[in-house]
C-alpha cells in the first residue's frame, strides 16, 4: 500500500513541477517591514536566532515567512511567548539588521555559561519557518546549558507533493548558507551543525566548500549531525566520498538512518539509488548487497575515527512517515543528547562489520533497561 502511494506521489509531483511557482501577490511584495525591526539589546539567552532566504511576510502585525525565494535575506530572532510548561507553543519573531544580528549572536556566544559554543540547524523537506524553529529548539533543549542557536530557513513549499520544488530551492539557497557559515566560523571556534532531511545537502555542500576555501576556519566546526539525510548514500560513504570531507580536521560526524523512513523511500524512487538516511539494501550501488533486502543494514560506512552511523528503526514514533524518529522518540533524543554532550550511548549495538565497514543500531530494549527518563 505504501509503495503504491509512493508511486502516485512521485507521478503527481512530477506533473505539478511543470506548473511553476506563482508570483507573490502585490500585497506581499509591497508590504513594509520596517516596523518588524528590533534591537539586539533585547535578545535574551533563551531566544533563537534565524537567517531566512524565504520571503518575509510583513502584512500582519506578526512577522511570517512565505514559501517564496528571496535574495533579500532576513536576519532576526525569535522569543518564546507560551506558558511555562510550553514556552514555544507561541512565539514572536523580530528582524535585525545583519550587522546587529552578527554582533548580538557573537556576544551571546561569548557570554559566561555558554561554553563559547554555537548550534546551527538546517531544516528539511516540507518544513516551514515554524517547523524549523521547533526542531532547532528541540535540539537546543537537549543541552544542559543555554547554547546560542541559529535556525537556517529556506523556502520549502510545505507540501507532500512539493518535493521537486523543495529539492530545487535547497540547491538555490546553497550559496546563502555557504556565506552564512563563512561568517559564523569567524566568530567562534566550537560550532555544531545539525541538519534534517534535505537540509543535509546544504550542510555537506557548505562544509566541503569551506574546507577548500579556509581550512583553518573550517576546523572550528567540531560536530556534524545528519538526521535522516536525503542525500545519495554512495556519494557520501564511498572511498574518497563526502564523509572524508566532513571528518576533516578531526570532527565528530553522526549519521542517523532507518529502513522505515517513508519520505526517503519516495526519494529513492525519484533518484534511483539509496539515500544516506536509509539502511535499505535493495537499491545499493554495491549491487552484491541488494539481496540482503530492506532489513539488511546497508547503512554501514568506512571504519574512520569520529564517524558513527546509527540505524534508528527501533525508535518507532508511530504513524507511517517515520522521517523524524530521532526528534520524536525518547531513545532518539537521548542518543542525540549524548552526541551533543559527549556522553556514553549504551543503548547502541554494534552491527557486525562487513568488508571493513561499521555501524550501529539503536535498541529500545537496551535503552529502557538503562534509563527510565525521556529527554525533552
PLM feature spans:
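Alpha/beta-hydrolase fold active-site loops
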Residues: 117
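C-terminal motif of bacterial Sec signal peptides marking the signal peptidase cleavage site
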Residues: 15-18
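Lipolytic serine-hydrolase domain surface
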Residues: 20-114, 127, 133-149, 153-189, ...
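The conserved beta1-alpha1 loop
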Residues: 120-124, 196
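Bacterial N-terminal signal peptides that target proteins for export
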Residues: 1-8
Amino acid at each position: 500500500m505504501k509503495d503504491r502511494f509512493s508511486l502516485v506521489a512521485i507521478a503527481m509531483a512530477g506533473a505539478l513541477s511543470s506548473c511553476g511557482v506563482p508570483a507573490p501577490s502585490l500585497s506581499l511584495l509591497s508590504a513594509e517591514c520596517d516596523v518588524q525591526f528590533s534591537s539586539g539589546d533585547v535578545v535574551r539567552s533563551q531566544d533563537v536566532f534565524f537567517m531566512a532566504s524565504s520571503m518575509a511576510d510583513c502584512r500582519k502585525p506578526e512577522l511570517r515567512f512565505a514559501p517564496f525565494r528571496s535574495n533579500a535575506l532576513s536576519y532576526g530572532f525569535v522569543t518564546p511567548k507560551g506558558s511555562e510548561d510550553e514556552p514555544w507553543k507561541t512565539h514572536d519573531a523580530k528582524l535585525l539588521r545583519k550587522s546587529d544580528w552578527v554582533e548580538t549572536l557573537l556576544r551571546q556566544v561569548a557570554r559566561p555559561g555558554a561554553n563559547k559554543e554555537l548550534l546551527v540547524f538546517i531544516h528539511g523537506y516540507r518544513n516551514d519557518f515554524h517547523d524549523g524553529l521547533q526542531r532547532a529548539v528541540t535540539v537546543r533543549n537537549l543541552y544542559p546549558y543555554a547554547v546560542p542557536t541559529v535556525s537556517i530557513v529556506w523556502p520549502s513549499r510545505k507540501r507532500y507533493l512539493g518535493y521537486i520544488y523543495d529539492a530545487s530551492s535547497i540547491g538555490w539557497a546553497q550559496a546563502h548558507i555557504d556565506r552564512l557559515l563563512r561568517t559564523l566560523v569567524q566568530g567562534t571556534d566550537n560550532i555544531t551543525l545539525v541538519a534534517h532531511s534535505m537540509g543535509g545537502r546544504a550542510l555537506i555542500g557548505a562544509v566541503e566548500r569551506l574546507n577548500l576555501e579556509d581550512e583553518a576556519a573550517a576546523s572550528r566546526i567540531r560536530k556534524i549531525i545528519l538526521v535522516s539525510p536525503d542525500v545519495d548514500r554512495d556519494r557520501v560513504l564511498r572511498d574518497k566520498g563526502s564523509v572524508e570531507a566532513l571528518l576533516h580536521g578531526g570532527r565528530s560526524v553522526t549519521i542517523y538512518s532507518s529502513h522505515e523512513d517513508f519520505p526517503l523511500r519516495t526519494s529513492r524512487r525519484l533518484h534511483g539509488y539509496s539515500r544516506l538516511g536509509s539502511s535499505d539494501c535493495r537499491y545499493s550501488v554495491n549491487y552484491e548487497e541488494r539481496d540482503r533486502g530492506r532489513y539488511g543494514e546497508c547503512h554501514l560506512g568506512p571504519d574512520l575515527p569520529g564517524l558513527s552511523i546509527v540505524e534508528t528503526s527501533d525508535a518507532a514514533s508511530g504513524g507511517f512517515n517515520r522521517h523524524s524518529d530521532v526528534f520524536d522518540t525518547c531513545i532518539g533524543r537521548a542518543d542525540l543528547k549524548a552526541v551533543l554532550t559527549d556522553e556514553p550511548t549504551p543503548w547502541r549495538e554494534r552491527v557486525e562489520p562487513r568488508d571493513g565497514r561499521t555501524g550501529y543500531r539503536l535498541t529500545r530494549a537496551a535503552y529502557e533497561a538503562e534509563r527510565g527518563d525521556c529527554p525533552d
